[in-house]
């Protein structure tokens, strides 16, 4: 029996869509704290799910459910349209459950993520940032992979802003550039980072260079340690010979 309309999958195809999830927290100035905020709340924060470079993700993401700490009233918040975020105030850090619900055309089950809310600066210069009351940003780059998507969902994933189909052909660099110029959707990581988005090809290449340099340093350290070991064994053998101590032989 043939598959019902809209239930056929595009075989042999996997499509990924990138997004960013995380939180931003800003400490209150004690002298300018809003009157409605509880006395023990020290920060205002927001938790979010958004596209890379704030690209629209609502064509594949229907809604997002945030499960906050049980001490919050209505601690399960469902956001059904962009921006997919929740803003609150508080004093403590905790794990936030984030559940992604996809559009009906996808036929996909919800996926769950976890994010650790950060209120206090971390990493290098944390104390300076704390004194300046800087915004604490904790976010992660993630990719959703849709394997063999339903045909209607495939059309949504590959369509442009007006559900225009992408051009068929060999593709390549020129096709990607054309899609970007006409505002088409792309899953490509941007070439350069921006203040709003630290994820880019440039950042990726810098990290690869850093890892390569670290690997070379480790290899050099291993080489030097091996040379020192050989030298020590040589001196030990000379000492044994001068003292008339027979050299140790390895048992077979």
UniProtKB/Swiss-Prot annotation:
It is found in: Cytoplasm; Nucleus. Residues 158-168 have a biased composition (Low complexity). InterPro entries: YEAST_sf, YEATS, YEATS_dom. One of its GO terms (cellular component) is cytoplasm. One of its GO terms (biological process) is DNA repair. Keywords: Activator, Chromatin regulator, Coiled coil, Cytoplasm, DNA damage, DNA repair, Nucleus, Transcription, Transcription regulation. Residues 9-160 form the YEATS domain. It holds the Pfam family YEATS. Residues 156-219 are annotated as: Disordered. Belongs to the YAF9 family. Component of the SWR1 chromatin-remodeling complex and of the NuA4 histone acetyltransferase complex. This is Protein AF-9 homolog. It comes from Aspergillus fumigatus (strain ATCC MYA-4609 / CBS 101355 / FGSC A1100 / Af293) (Neosartorya fumigata).
